[in-house]
A protein has these predicted regions:
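A generic structural signal for alpha->beta connector loops
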Residues: 8, 37, 77, 103-105, ...
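S-adenosylmethionine
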Residues: 17, 25, 29-30, 87, ...
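General small-molecule cofactor/ligand-binding pocket signal
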Residues: 12, 81, 107-109, 203-206
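Residue-level signal for pocket-adjacent positions within structured domains
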Residues: 4-6, 13-15, 108, 147-151, ...
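Conserved SAM/SAH cofactor-binding pocket of Class I
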Residues: 29-125, 131-145
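A structure-centric signal for secondary-structure junctions around beta-strands
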Residues: 6, 21-22, 77, 217, ...
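SAM-dependent Rossmann-like transferase core, predominantly class I methyltransferases
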Residues: 2-39, 45-58, 222, 237
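SAM/dcSAM-binding transferase cores
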Residues: 215-259
Length: 259
């Protein structure tokens, strides 16, 4: 059995279509999480890693804000729903959730984003999310991966697109809600344009580069309903002079064993 060990939880990493990866961990560590958040949605959860990171961060914040007295206490205070179109990934995520300290707050569901949206409408609950997050597929033009499940996890032509995510967010975010995504840097212009078309505005962007001499290859972009004239704009360098940078180690300190 392949197990990826973080400081406070473990992830079974055997069968999911998308394994634990740097992009996902960066999103989980860097996205904005508030102690006032109650309803969170992970779209394309894979192993469930980002949802687990969100749970850990929320309970740390809540404890500091005196929202809850125990790490697994007040289960009604936080609900994280994690969906994926791949049934095997959902089974693995559910197992990882069950083995975590926050198992009462995490739920894995086998559904596409469209199916999940329809189910929300069918329930008539008017449920809104304070945070939606995703590490969506991004290989629009590349050759399709040979294995179909991994193909769906990596390619927008067969799976989820950021356009769908933004359109869903426009309908299902709470008034103060945010959507956070990790994507290739070259998608920035189209991403922000499509967000504006859906009434969403960039308030924070983290530009990720592997080493100082290279241009950013990834962005973590965060949007809300509220206009922001000067979005927070930060550059993160992963490695410097052959070792992990201090800023990267600081960002991932609560998760990676080596940080």
């Amino acid at each position: 059995m392949s197990i990826f060990r973080f400081k406070r939880f473990e992830v079974i990493n055997d069968r999911s279509a998308m394994k634990v990866n740097t992009d996902g961990v960066l999103l989980g560590a860097a996205m904005t999480v508030n102690p006032s958040d109650r309803m969170l949605l992970d779209v394309g959860t894979g192993t469930g890693t980002i949802a687990l990171m969100a749970a850990q961060r929320w309970f740390d914040l809540a404890r500091n804000e005196n929202v809850g007295s125990r790490e697994t206490g007040m289960p009604e205070s936080l609900k994280i729903t994690a969906i994926d179109i791949d049934e095997i990934s959902v089974e693995e995520a559910a197992r990882n959730f069950a083995n975590s300290p926050w198992h009462e707050n995490l739920q894995a569901q086998h559904a596409s984003l469209d199916e999940f949206s329809v189910s929300l409408q069918g329930e008539g609950s008017g449920e809104k999310f304070d945070l939606i997050f995703s590490n969506p597929p991004y290989f629009d033009e590349s050759l399709l991966a040979p294995e179909q499940r991994r193909c769906n996890a990596r390619h927008t032509s067969t799976g989820l697109s950021y356009r769908e995510l933004l359109e869903f967010a426009a309908e299902h975010l709470s008034d103060g809600g945010r959507i956070s995504m990790v994507l290739p840097a070259e998608t920035e212009a189209a991403l922000t344009r499509h967000a504006r078309m859906n009434g969403l505005h960039l308030f924070r962007i983290l530009r990720v580069r592997t080493v100082p001499r290279k241009s950013p290859s990834r962005i973590i972009a965060e949007f809300s309903r509220h206009r922001c004239d000067e979005p927070e704009d930060v550059i993160l360098t992963i490695q410097n002079e052959g070792k992990y940078s201090e800023e990267y180690l600081s960002l991932t300190h609560d998760f990676y064993l080596f940080a």
